[in-house]
């Protein structure tokens, strides 16, 4: 409501307006909390059906392992929740929801020469992750993104690693990381063929963890399918640790 219009209201009317706004704000907050709790309850039911352990709160042990992955170094006010875990034939599979907030400057030309806080906008980004911790497994830190997805890491100078003998993989994905030689040793034909079966794969990996990232929170009816596909896909990395040439000292 415009300030001039508020100034024309009587004190009693203004009081009702303020109370109304406060009530609506409070209701919105309560509804948000309710839906968050309801989603956690629904995910716990799914986890129980699959024989998975569930926690609505973050797994600090796993989160500590992921701190060096690109996504987990972005933004501020990050949050890991609704963690589902189980041991599979490939390793410890974890599925969880993750979000972070990021404040960006508006790109409109009229804002570029100012520093007013109104020139900035904070956005919250939501993701669904599946991670696989593989015993006796060690890999270089790397990220794989679908081709055409430019991000901060590449824009800051890191180069896409290509394989001339596997054009399907190189033309479909961006692969990058600090240890190019180690990454080239790690990626064999079998692994690149695995990516050819999942062209939208967005993967971050390092040490004994491989993570598959999806944008947004998944629909409840899609969770079971995602878990099964993630375990199969991430399990395809396990063979790489069998080759001594792929091991880092």
Tell where the protein language model's regions lie, with residue ranges.
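Charged, low-complexity intrinsically disordered regions
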Residues: 42-249
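Short, strongly hydrophobic alpha-helical membrane anchors
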Residues: 1-13
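Hydrophobic H-region at the start of alpha-helical membrane spans
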Residues: 15-23
């Amino acid at each position: 409501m415009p300030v001039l219009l508020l100034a024309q209201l009587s004190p009693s009317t203004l009081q009702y307006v303020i109370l109304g706004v406060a009530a609506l704000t409070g209701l919105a907050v309560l509804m948000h909390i309710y839906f968050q709790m309801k989603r956690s309850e629904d995910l716990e039911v799914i986890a129980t059906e699959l024989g998975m352990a569930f926690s609505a709160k973050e797994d600090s042990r796993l989160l500590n392992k992921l701190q060096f992955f690109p996504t987990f170094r972005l933004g501020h006010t990050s949050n890991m929740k609704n963690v589902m875990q189980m041991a599979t034939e490939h390793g410890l599979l974890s599925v969880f929801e993750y979000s972070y907030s990021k404040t960006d400057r508006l790109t409109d030309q009229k804002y570029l020469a100012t520093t007013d806080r109104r020139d900035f906008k904070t956005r919250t980004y939501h993701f669904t992750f599946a991670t696989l911790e593989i015993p006796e497994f060690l890999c270089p830190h790397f990220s794989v993104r679908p081709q055409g997805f430019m991000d901060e890491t590449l824009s800051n100078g890191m180069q896409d690693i290509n394989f001339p003998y596997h054009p399907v993989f190189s033309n479909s994905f961006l692969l990058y990381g600090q240890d190019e030689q180690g990454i080239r040793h790690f990626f064999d034909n079998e692994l690149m063929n695995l990516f050819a079966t999942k062209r939208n794969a967005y993967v971050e990996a390092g040490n004994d963890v491989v993570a598959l990232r999806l944008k947004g929170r998944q629909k409840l009816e899609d969770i079971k399918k995602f878990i099964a596909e993630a375990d199969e896909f991430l399990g395809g990395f396990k063979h790489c640790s069998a080759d001594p040439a792929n091991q880092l000292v």
